[in-house]
Amino acid sequence: MVPRNFSESQLRPEPERAPSNSTKISYRSHSSSFEADDERSSSADHDSMGPDIGSAHRDVPAQYAGEDTRLTSRKELSGWYAYGFAAEVFVICGIGSFIPITLEQLARENGVLLSDPTQPCGSSSTHLPPGLHPGSAKDSQCVIYLGGLQINTASFAMYSFSLSVLFQAILVVSISCAADHGNYRKRLLLFFAFAGSITTMLFLTVVPKVYLLGALWAIISNTCFGASFVLLNSFLPLLVRHHPKAQYGTPDFSPEFRPSSVDESPPEHSLNEPEVAVYDERSALLAHNRISSQASDVAEPFPLSKDSTSIELQLSTQISSTGIGIGYSAGLFLQCVSIVIIWLLNGTTFSLRLVLFFIGLWWFLFTIPAALWLRPRPGPPLPHTGGENSKGSRSWLAYTIYAWSSLFRTVKLARRLKDITFFLAAWFLLSDAIATVSGTAVLYAKTQLRMAPEALGLINVIATTAGVLGAFSWAAISRTLNLKPHQTILACICIFEMIPLYGLLGFLPIVKRWNVVGLQQPWEMYPLGFVYGFVLGGLSSYCRSLFGELIPPGSEAAFYALYAITDKGSSVFGPAIVGAIVDRTGEIRPAFWFLAVLVGLPAPLIYFVNVERGKKEGAKLAEIIEGFKIKDAESAGEGSRGSSIDHESGQNEGLIYPRVGENAGRGRNDI
């Protein structure tokens, strides 16, 4: 927090852009009743957050009514980070740890032994005697009967997760258009955040007799979480595009700077003049002091130099990694609190439900800062529907229909993009592996290794700590080894493959005789938890930022919806297949064969991803989509108006792409 000690008359001049032809013309939005009051006026620039380059107003022609292209502010970035701090605890502590074991425990208290249907199962800590080899535990498996089907209690949790992912995928597609067009991006984010957090708190009301209600709350909360994070991800390219470092060009974040001047002629400097404070990846977006009272608060770089990796990709990776690290830190803290609660209450089912209540409460409370600080960043009006004149159910029906039709069209066009196709195919498999390995490991530790809930929570603490370390370390590792983003992802995959392969060692007769190694002892889960977390910290940030670099500009939410469908949609299959394997064999260990294949398959696909080629193909795709939009506008009787808008401002009904003639020989500088 920086104290404000200067008046309105001391406002710094508007920053002068460095000569660069790679960024878009933009202007300050005066719209959105949904953004915080302190983000709507010039006086807001003097808040407690300190002087902020992100508040600079740029009075240039608008590309569509209500567009907000103010520079990204420190407060806005804080809002983006705040939601990660709020919601990551759900996926780390909830989905990644306590929701699966709570569902399994609730089902177990209503189940019977597979070997003796007249015998109730009891708790998971009593059904398998100490020292009993997991391979001989088939007769001790617990099952429930649901709709005439016999389901293993571990499979019940996996099936619940698969079902939640299915609904999540459908919802993500349906809301993608509302996020891309109009002023719904932030509203939907907050709606799903509060709905998901409240549903998570409702786990406190679930008792064993109504264990199916627990599955319902899990489905709703996970669906809301996934939808909210898709909306959060759609903010990332916009935050990067309008970030001062991207707009004013600071390659490698270590450029030479010159003070901006109100005069168009370059200022003359003396060698003994004090330097102007500059921004780098280690400094806040706000200057905490003024090196010279004569210098402007805003520093302007020299023209951009060519770099093998774009400024946007570096910045996107930095912001994404920081967000992941902040979220993991929150998850780590709450996980430790949860372990204490479970230990104090002796690991009862009530203690698990109480922990889930606190997870939902955390999610709810820390969403409030995001609601206050995050700007809506509205998109253009929805084409052919009358824009804001369409209201109520008809408006939402139009958004939903348009979203699905746009998805099918986007999929058809995306097939022409070689690198996006490679990446999405790899991400389909990789994200499924990430989700399935996590759930399978937790349930294996609970049912096969008889680990208590607090011990399972400790595994997650280790994984989360490693995730924080990985989120901040992989960037340094990548720089040290001079790895490209896709090579960093490949390194993560190779390490990730160690987890299922280690579990498969338990099938070797010689290893079985050792009664250790190959996940035969509970302590073995802890080092594997570290490996999982460290790898996930790198994959989460690098995959998200790499895909952001390939997205055609102006359609972020739609393409991130496709990213999320590929991500969450794939997770319908992995847990369901593992559940089927468990139901068939009575054990979880055979599922490691499936996981080993699932983790390894994405590697060759990621290997062929080329970012620079993908960016060029994205520019071509932009022109193709633009042609579709013009054709649709003409067929709706709006051809003349659409052509006028297109020629005058380069905007075409919500998809903003470079004009072919204007951008010949120009590299794209936004993601």
Swiss-Prot record:
This is Autophagy-related protein 22-2. The lineage of its organism: Eukaryota, Fungi, Dikarya, Ascomycota, Pezizomycotina. It comes from Sclerotinia sclerotiorum (strain ATCC 18683 / 1980 / Ss-1) (White mold). Gene3D superfamilies: MFS general substrate transporter like domains. It is found in: Vacuole membrane. The chain crosses the membrane at residues 83-103, 155-175, 188-208, 212-232, 324-344, 354-374, 422-442, 457-477, 491-511, 523-543, 560-582, 591-611. Keywords: Amino-acid transport, Autophagy, Glycoprotein, Membrane, Transmembrane, Transmembrane helix, Transport, Vacuole. InterPro entries: Atg22, Atg22-like, ATG22/LtaA_families, MFS_trans_sf. Belongs to the ATG22 family. It comes from the Eukaryota.
